[in-house]
Structure formats: structure tokens, C-alpha cells
Swiss-Prot record:
Keywords: Cytoplasm, Methyltransferase, Nucleotide biosynthesis, Transferase. GO terms for cellular component: cytosol. The keyword Secreted does not apply. Gene3D superfamilies: Thymidylate synthase/dCMP hydroxymethylase domain (3.30.572.10). It is found in: Cytoplasm. This is Thymidylate synthase.
């Protein structure tokens, strides 16, 4: 995961100090790209321990099209708690846009189901794009999409993914985002009869919060360990049939977790 540590170091050393929506303050750079060859191990940060249950269940929650945190809380995942209302609702966030985008004529568009079928039907398409950035729905969202748009690319039997992330909390959020979209790429490759290629992560405003600087320095002092391996249940042939137990990450040997506050 040297790509991630290079980003962390660059923002720490060269980032421009800027105010932000949360009032915390950041150091940021604009425009950064990382590339991970998914055939060479699962891109999970090893220089601090990540909460795998949260990463996996959040992705499954997105794929279920849900916008209420009840599913997450049931599985002891609390990464969205700060933004939910008293009923657990977040408004039309990722799950709604991925699975039930409201068309102009009122009918709902299942972007993810369409994507699976289109990869099978027309793998050379340049339109294998999913967007969570629904301008009309932004005012109703508890938190507007940070990872806003992603595209898939098929070549030589390999499925690659590129994510555009407009806002990137590089200490807390980005390690989760890398793992989540790498996992999604593996799952999609399996159900479409492909193997994994690259995950390309393009960042807009890549920022380190002022109260994460000390933690970032600690992390940069650690030497990365070997990447783990992802094992999916090969019996699963439908993307929407994956469960938590179908996803196993082997050989993850991280350093201890580094606590840091979430900017809300």
C-alpha cells in the first residue's frame, strides 16, 4: 500500500491549509490518483488495523439499496450513526441512487442491476458508469456523496474499476473506500465471468484533517506488511446474493488501530 502512504505523506508535507465545512481545518491537495493491481493482493491498509466488518457490511448495505442505518446497527456497524436522524434515516444517499435513481418520468432506475447485465452483454461499452451524484436529491441527503461516480472497463477478460471521489478524508475514509471498491470489483468480476484487473482511485479534494496530523505521522512511521488475499464463495453467481459469510479476507496482519475523531 505504498501508493496510499505516498498520498498521506504528500498531503502532510505539501498540503495547503484550508478551512472546511466541519470547522476542523484541513491540509489538502487537489487531484491525485492511485492504481492498484487487484491480482497482486487485496488493497487493505496494513499500517493500521481497519474494521473489516464495517467495510463489508457497508457495501452490502449499499447494494441492498437501503438508506436507513437499521441494517448497519444490527451488524454492529456505526460509521453512519452521526449523520442519521432519530429514525435512522439518511435521505436518498448511495443505496437509493445505486438501486432506485428516480427518472424524469417517475420510474426508478436500478443502476447496479443494469451494470451487471451490460458488462455481460456489451463489455466493451464506454458507458459502464454508476453515479451517486443526483443533483436534484442532494438537498435531502444527510451527507452528499464523497465517492460520487465510478466506471468499469473490460479488456483481455479483466474487469477494472475507476472511482472519482470528490472529497477524500485520507486518514479515516480513503482506506475504507479503497477496500470497498476493490471488493465490489471482485464481486462483479465473479458474477460476470471475468477476473480482476486494476482499481484506479482518482481523488478531487484529498485532505487531512488538522486533528489527524499526529495520527498520520504515526502511521507513516510503520513499514507496510504483505497484502492479504480475498476469498469469495465461488458458488455465488448473483451479485445480490452475496452475504457477509461469502466474503473472507485471509492473511490480514495489520499494526494496531489508530484512533482519530470523525469530522461531522
Amino acid at each position: 500500500m505504498k501508493q496510499y502512504l505516498e498520498l498521506l505523506n504528500d498531503v502532510l508535507v505539501h498540503g495547503i491549509k484550508k478551512p472546511d465545512r466541519t470547522g476542523t481545518g484541513t491540509r489538502s491537495v487537489f487531484g491525485w490518483q492511485m492504481r492498484f493491481d487487484l491480482s497482486q493482493g487485496f488493497p487493505l491498509v496494513t499500517t493500521k488495523k481497519l474494521h473489516l466488518r464495517s467495510i463489508i457490511h457497508e457495501l452490502l448495505w449499499f447494494l441492498r439499496g437501503e438508506t436507513n442505518i437499521a441494517y448497519l446497527k444490527k451488524h454492529q456497524v456505526h460509521i453512519w450513526d452521526e449523520w442519521a436522524d432519530a429514525t435512522g434515516e439518511l435521505g436518498p444517499v448511495y443505496g437509493k441512487q445505486w438501486r432506485r435513481w428516480a427518472g424524469a418520468d417517475g420510474h426508478e432506475i436500478d443502476q447496479i442491476r443494469w451494470l451487471v447485465e451490460e458488462i455481460k452483454r456489451n463489455p466493451d461499452s464506454r458507458r459502464l458508469v454508476i453515479s451517486a451524484w443526483n443533483v436534484a436529491d442532494l438537498p435531502q441527503m444527510a451527507l452528499v456523496p464523497c465517492h460520487a461516480l465510478f466506471q468499469f472497463y473490460v479488456a483481455n477478460g479483466k474487469l477494472s474499476c475507476q472511482l472519482y471521489q470528490r472529497s477524500a478524508d485520507i486518514f479515516l475514509g480513503v482506506p475504507f473506500n479503497i477496500a470497498s471498491y476493490a471488493l465490489l470489483t471482485h464481486m462483479l468480476a465473479q458474477v460476470t465471468g471475468l477476473v480482476v484487473g486494476d482499481f484506479v482511485h482518482t481523488l478531487g479534494d484529498a485532505h487531512l484533517y488538522a486533528n489527524h496530523v499526529e495520527q498520520a505521522s504515526v502511521q507513516l512511521g510503520r513499514v507496510p506488511r504483505p497484502q492479504p488475499v480475498l476469498r469469495l464463495n465461488q458458488a455465488v453467481t448473483d451479485l445480490f446474493d452475496f452475504t457477509y459469510d461469502d466474503i473472507v479476507i485471509e492473511g490480514y496482519d495489520p499494526y494496531p488501530a489508530i484512533k482519530a475523531p470523525v469530522a461531522v
